[in-house]
Structure formats: structure tokens, C-alpha cells
Amino acid sequence: MDPSGSDEDADADFDTQVIIQQSLLDVYKPGIAQHTPEAARLHSFPSDDYKKIAEAIETGKEDALAGFAKYHPAFDEANGNGWLPLHKAAVQLNKNILEITMNASEPSTWERTTHNGETALFLAVSSSLLENAHFLLLKGCNPNAKTSEGNSPLLTAVLKDAYDMATLLISHGADVNLRCANERTALHEAAKLGRLDMVKLMLASGAYPDARSSYGFTPLALAAQGGHTGIMQLLLQKGADVHSQASDSSSVLLEAVRGGNPEAVSLLLEYGADANIPKSSGHLPIHVAADKGHFLALKVLVPVTDIAAIKKSGISPVHCAAAGAHPHCLELLIQAGFDVNFMLDQRIRKHYDDQRKSALYFAVSNGDLPSVKLLLSAGALPNQDPVNCLQIALRMGNYELISLLLRHGANVNYFCRVNPLHFPSALQYTLKDEVMLRMLLNYGYDTERCFDCPHGERVHRFCTFEGWTSTVIKDTMFCEVITLSWLQHLSGKVVRVMLDYVDQVQICSKLKAVLEKQRLWPEIHFILANPRSLQHLCRLKIRKCMGRLRLRCPVFMSFLPLPNLLKAYVLYKEYDLFGQERSTGTW
């Protein structure tokens, strides 16, 4: 605390209090504040007369209300919500109450609104009180007065599905083309809600069929969103533009596809809608159908969509079906001949942090096994993306997905672009899981690089491990990783498994020092100190001659002139823990 500034602070607080008090006094000085009738109403409470009138209205006491008619000023008062007695009377079932109240009110109050901008007529319409609305209209109330939200009585009648009310309003001058909230007309709302009778009424009363909302949607587009084919047919017959586009260039056809009604899609195509017009994002109707999983709509769009338009968009519907996890749509597209190896255009890829390109990557990221199977069976390549599909599956720990990718040629020896290690990156996800580790090793993981250390038996120079961050790019050795304090306990098991897949290897001094403390060190030492069996060396030689691609190819293995038992040995089937349906994998 600073005592030197206490006097100044006290003076400042005193001055502030004086200013606040003076301003409050000024507000309530006669002639300064509340100098208008409107301000007086806002700052005053309802009088006793108002309360008596309101009670008579709400309880339906006609005689009592008629007796209060002489208190004209009270009929000009409003409560905290801005409701006049006339507003309260407008929502009563007894029309006589409204007549008495209106006759007692000054004509200047007939168009007065509540704090929400609602007139007495609007309140009667929103309460679906036809007789009250009729009476107010006969008195000359404005049928086109809008609320603060921009809603008109006619639009409210449409929302309430009150056909007779809408007819009444139109007969008394309601504008069917009046722009309401979001620049929508009553026809917009009727079309959106699928109210055919209302649409017919609006069109018969002169509604413009192609009015655009603030987002550029026409009534036809809104009807298409809901799949209201009867209304769409009527609008098209009245000349609605089938080629109209919204502010984002979304076509009516695209909106119909978004709704998923195949009959609506077919109807628009019959009237000449173009399936090759993209929205501003570049997406075509076929993309939307695939993404939403609308199978029947997709089936209609496939034959009418040009491949050139798809290429220009930079994204295939195959991507969309895979991203949305819709294998039934994916199967349809594959059967129709769409390329499963179509890669995202650069302008699309930049929206993804991982710079993904293939449809397979989307399916793997979703853990969508049926879609992955379909794509791989159709020839999808698993090594096309900057982040390898196998890496995503390993991160998930999904055995079946990993096995599926490996059987179709996923590269077990990929290297991450960030923090590349001296050994292939896939290993780091399997250190705690023998099932996944064996999967990688069985499919040709480069185990020898894990034992490749330039220091050998020499003492490693001391250095602190900098950690794995995007700012640390170095050729980190396996011995540096597995000897970390939080991984040392895994070193014995990992190295022991790896020895099943290599010939004689040298263990560097740093790794050896850690292994000597592990339970499996005697077994590891025995293997390292003795020649490997001829059977084991032959397996390694055969695998090396065959190559990784042939090893994972079932067709090639079936034609190999070897006994089945020997084939199984070459493929390390005795170590295929996932194939043996073992559920344990954590050490």
C-alpha cells in the first residue's frame, strides 16, 4: 500500500460521489426529466384505474369494464411490458371485451405497440382469434405493421397455419409481398413449412414466386430444402426460376440434395436444373449427397454429373462419402467407376492441418473399417498422404485397421516429417503393445536400423534429451529413445522381440547398460553371444529375397512352390498374435 497517494484517492472518490448525486437529482427535477408523455409512461407505474381495467379484461367482466370506460387516461397507460388495455383485450376469447376496450380507447392508441413492437391486431392474429382480428381490421388497424423482429400479421398467420386468418388479412389489404425478418415474405415461410394451401393462397393473391431472402433463397429453394415436391411443382408451374442461386452460389438443386428427398432432386432435373453448378466453396450437389449419406439422391446425381466438373472442384464425392462415414454411398460411387485414388487439390488440402489428400485417409481417421475395406479392395493406395494412414491407425491402437492396411501394402518403414528418428517412426506407437509390434515386424519393419548406433561399444557422449517438439529436428537413435527414464522398463521386452527378426547384431554400450538391469537380459545375452540357428537364418534370407511387397501379397504366396508349413514359417505366423485372436497386448 502507498500512503503518499491516499489523500488524492479520497478526493477523487468524493468528487465522483458528488457528480453521481447531482446527475440523479437532475434526472428527477421537474421540467428536466420525464418532460414527454412517453417518458412519463416509461418511468411511472400503472395507476389503480389501469389495474382495475386490466383485471376486468382478464376476468371477462363486461359490465365492470363498461363502467371503467369513463377513465380514459387509464386506457392510455401501459404496464412494464408495454401492454395497453387494448393489447390485453385483443388476446381475450370474448370479442365483446375487445369492443368495449377499443371504444374506450383513443384512436391514437390503436396502432401503439408493446415493447416487442406488437400491435393489438398482431396479438389477435398470433393468438389465432379470428373474430378479434376481423373486428380490429374493420376498425382500420394496419395489417402490414411489423414487430421489432420484423414479423407481420400475415407471416404469423402462415406460421400458425391459420388459413382463414391469412385469407381475412389479405382481404383487408395485407401485402403478400411484404418483406419481413431476413427479407422473407409469407410465401417463403409457407414454402419452407410445406403448407401447400397457404402457398396456393399467396400465389393466387399475387405473391412473387422468385422473391429472394437476405441470404438469396427463393421460396422454391426453401421448399426444396424440405423436400416438399407438391409445392415445388406448383412454384415451377408458376414460373419460379429453377436456376436461381443463393448468396453463396448454392443452387436450388443443391438445397434439394441437402434435404435428401430423391423425388425433389428428380423433379428439379426434369425442369432443367444443372447438377454441375458449384457453390462458392466449389462443392457440387453430388458432394453434398455423398457427405450427407443421401443414397437415393446420390444415385440420381451420379449419371448427370460431369467428371470434368468434379475435377475442377478439386474434391471427389468419394472423399465426401469417406469423410461422412457412409460406406453404402462409397460402394455406389466405386461401382459407378469413380477413382478411389483421386487426390484433393492443394486449395482444399490447405484447410486441413495434416494436409491430407486421399479418401482413404478420411476413412482411416474416422476408424471406419467398412469404408477402409471398400477403398482398399477397390485399389486405394495407403501411402499417399503426408501423414501416413498407418500412423493414424497405430495411434488409435485399432488392430483390425492396422492389419488391414498392412495387408494392402501400408509402408511400415515410413518416417515422420516432424522429429524424424534414425529408425522408422511407426515403432514409437508400439513400444507398449506386443501385438502391434509383432504386426510391424512381421510385415518387414527395418529392425536393423534400431541397432545401428555410431558409438558402438564406446561411451556415448553425455547430452540431455531435448524432447520431441516441432522445434527439435534430429536423427535420434533407438538407444537414445528406449533408454529414457520413462521407457527403460520396456527395453528388455522390445529388444527381445526384435531379436526374432534379425541376424547377429551389436548392442551399443548405452543400450547394453540399461538391458543388463532388465529381467530378460540373460535370454538376450544368450542370443547375442551365440550363433543363430540355420532355420532362422534361412527364413531371414528368404524374406530378404522376396522383398516386403511380395511378402504381404497373398496371391504371390499362394503360387510360391513351398509347403504351407514353410510358408507360415516364412511369414512368422507363429508370432501373429492378432491372427491368433489374442486380446492381451500391454506389458
Swiss-Prot record:
Oligomer status and interactors: Interacts with MAPRE2; this interaction promotes MAPRE2 degradation.
One example of a Gene Ontology biological process annotation: intracellular signal transduction
SOCS box domain: residues covered: 521-576
InterPro entries assigned to the protein according to its UniProt record, in alphabetical order: Ankyrin_rpt, Ankyrin_rpt-contain_sf, Dendritic_Spine_Reg/Scaffold, SOCS_box, SOCS_box-like_dom_sf
Protein name, per record: Ankyrin repeat and SOCS box protein 14
Free-text domain note: The SOCS box domain mediates the interaction with the Elongin BC complex, an adapter module in different E3 ubiquitin-protein ligase complexes.
The family this protein is said to belong to: Belongs to the ankyrin SOCS box (ASB) family.
Superkingdom of origin organism: Eukaryota
UniProt keyword terms in alphabetical order: ANK repeat, Repeat
The species this protein was found in: Mus musculus
One Pfam family cited in the UniProt record for this chain: Ank_2
ANK repeats: 81-110, 116-145, 149-178, 182-211, 215-244, 248-277, 281-310, 313-342, 355-384, 385-414, 416-449
Disruption phenotype annotation: Asb14 silencing promotes cardiomyocyte nuclear proliferation after myocardial infarction in adult.
Pathway info: Protein modification; protein ubiquitination
Function noted in UniProt: May be a substrate-recognition component of a SCF-like ECS (Elongin-Cullin-SOCS-box protein) E3 ubiquitin-protein ligase complex which mediates the ubiquitination and subsequent proteasomal degradation of target proteins. Plays a role in the inhibition of cardiomyocyte nuclear proliferation by mediating the ubiquitination and degradation of MAPRE2.
